[in-house]
C-alpha cells in the first residue's frame, strides 16, 4: 500500500499565522502550518500561557483567563497579530470563527482571515436568507419550507408536501441547537 503525501509549496502563502484558538484546535492548526512551512503564533489567554501546545513555540498573551477578555477580544487578537507580524489569522472553530465583524476587522488591519468573507458570513448567517441566496444562485436545495413557518399547521402542511420525517430548525439556532426530528404530523 502506498501513501501519497502532499509537499509544502516552495514558498508558503503566509510566513507567519496567528492561531486565535486553544487546545486541540490550536494543535491541529499548528500541525497544518508546520506541513506548509508557516510559523504558527499562538494567541493565548493568561490561563493557557503554559499549555503543552505552546512549548517551544511563539505565543502572545491576549488577555485574562476568561474568554470574553481573551479569545473573544477582537481588538486584542488583531493587535497581537499585527505586533507579531502575522499576515494571516486562523480562528479555528467556535469563539470568533463565524463573526463577520471580526473577519472585517482582520481585513481592515491587513491580516488575512482564514475563513469565509464577512459578506459570506452575513449572507449565510441566517437560514432563510441563506436558502434564498442559494436558490437565486441556481443551487438545488433539500425540499422544505421557503422561509419561517407561522405555526404548527403550516409545519404540518410542509411535512405533508415533502414527506416525513422532517427536521424542524429554529431560525436562530446554530450548531445543532433548536433542531428536532418529526417522524409524522403528530410529532410536529
Q: Where are the model-predicted features located?
A:
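N-terminal beta-alpha lobe that positions the nucleotide/phosphoryl donor
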Residues: 2-188
Amino acid at each position: 500500500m502506498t501513501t501519497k503525501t502532499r509537499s509544502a509549496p516552495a514558498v508558503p502563502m503566509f510566513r507567519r499565522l496567528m492561531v486565535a484558538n486553544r487546545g486541540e484546535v490550536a494543535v491541529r492548526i499548528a500541525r497544518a502550518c508546520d506541513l506548509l512551512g508557516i510559523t504558527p503564533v499562538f494567541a493565548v489567554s493568561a490561563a493557557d500561557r503554559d499549555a503543552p501546545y505552546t512549548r517551544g513555540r511563539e505565543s502572545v498573551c491576549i488577555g485574562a483567563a476568561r474568554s470574553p477578555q481573551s479569545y473573544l477580544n477582537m481588538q486584542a487578537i488583531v493587535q497581537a497579530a499585527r505586533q507579531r507580524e502575522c499576515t494571516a489569522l486562523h480562528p479555528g472553530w467556535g469563539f470568533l470563527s463565524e463573526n463577520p465583524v471580526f473577519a472585517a476587522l482582520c481585513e481592515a488591519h491587513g491580516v488575512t482571515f482564514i475563513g469565509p468573507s464577512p459578506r459570506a458570513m452575513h449572507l449565510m448567517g441566517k437560514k432563510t436568507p441563506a436558502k434564498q441566496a442559494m436558490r437565486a444562485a441556481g443551487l438545488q436545495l433539500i425540499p422544505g419550507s421557503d422561509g419561517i413557518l407561522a405555526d404548527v399547521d403550516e409545519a404540518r402542511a410542509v411535512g405533508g408536501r415533502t414527506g416525513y420525517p422532517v427536521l424542524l430548525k429554529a431560525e436562530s439556532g446554530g450548531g445543532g441547537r433548536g433542531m428536532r426530528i418529526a417522524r409524522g404530523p403528530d410529532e410536529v
